[in-house]
A protein has these predicted regions:
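Tandem repeat scaffolds
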Residues: 1-136
Length: 136
């Protein structure tokens, strides 16, 4: 089972330029190297992308519902109209992410370790309640 998972992950990594529209639901892509990947309109519902490198990736229109992106590097990724309902962004690096809105963020799960782009500010009133302010 582990060997099968590793082979599938390597296959996905090697075709990262051609993943637009791909069905990657429930994919196990922990620590995957997907920098600059074309994941436009990809279905990543409930995918495990813990500590994955998605820097510079095109995630426009991608469905990340319930995906786990804890500690993932999304710096410089394009998240235009990406679906983030119940997405886990705890500790994720979103610095320099393009086209991310408060409407998207408010649907996701994140914590004080999540790094947001400079145009997004999170105002915490306590550990669980916050307000997102979009500077765009």
């Amino acid at each position: 089972m582990l060997e099968e998972w590793i082979l599938k992950k390597k296959e996905i990594e090697s075709s990262k330029d051609r993943l637009n529209g791909a069905d990657l639901c429930y994919a196990k892509l922990m620590e995957a190297e997907l920098s600059d990947a074309n994941l436009e309109e990809a279905d990543l519902t409930a995918a495990y992308l813990i500590r994955a490198d998605l820097s510079g990736a095109n995630l426009s229109g991608a469905d990340l519902t319930q995906a786990v992106l804890s500690e993932a590097n999304l710096s410089g990724a394009d998240m235009n109209e990406a679906e983030l309902t119940d997405t886990f962004l705890n500790g994720a690096n979103l610095q320099g992410v393009l086209n991310l809105t408060c409407d998207q963020i408010e649907l996701a799960n994140f914590d004080k370790d999540t790094i947001f782009p400079s145009y997004i500010r999170i105002k915490w009133s306590n550990d669980r309640i916050c307000e997102c302010v979009d500077g765009n």
